[in-house]
Design a protein with these regions (language model features):
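N-terminal intrinsically disordered, cationic/polar leader segments
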Residues: 3-24, 28-73
Length: 73
């Protein structure tokens, strides 16, 4: 299994918060800011953790209003 890399565009104000949330789930993923002005991020998801990350993103969308749009780089 390999690390899954997915790119998203979120609201600029949510980058720091999402990064903090991802870091709190020790080792499931790394968030990298690709373009801070366009608010494009890359999630590097650890093998076997994809489902957890997708569930987390769905929960953040519902509970915190963090909207992410998949971006093709």
């Amino acid at each position: 299994m390999e690390t899954v890399k997915l790119s998203y565009q979120i609201e600029r104000k949510d980058i720091s918060y999402l990064s903090w949330i991802i870091q709190s789930y020790d080792g499931i993923a790394v968030l990298k800011t690709i373009d801070p002005y366009k608010a494009i991020i890359e999630l590097q998801i650890s093998p076997g953790c994809e489902e957890v990350v997708f569930e987390l993103l769905d929960a953040l969308k519902e509970e915190e209003g963090i909207i992410s749009t998949t971006v093709n780089l």
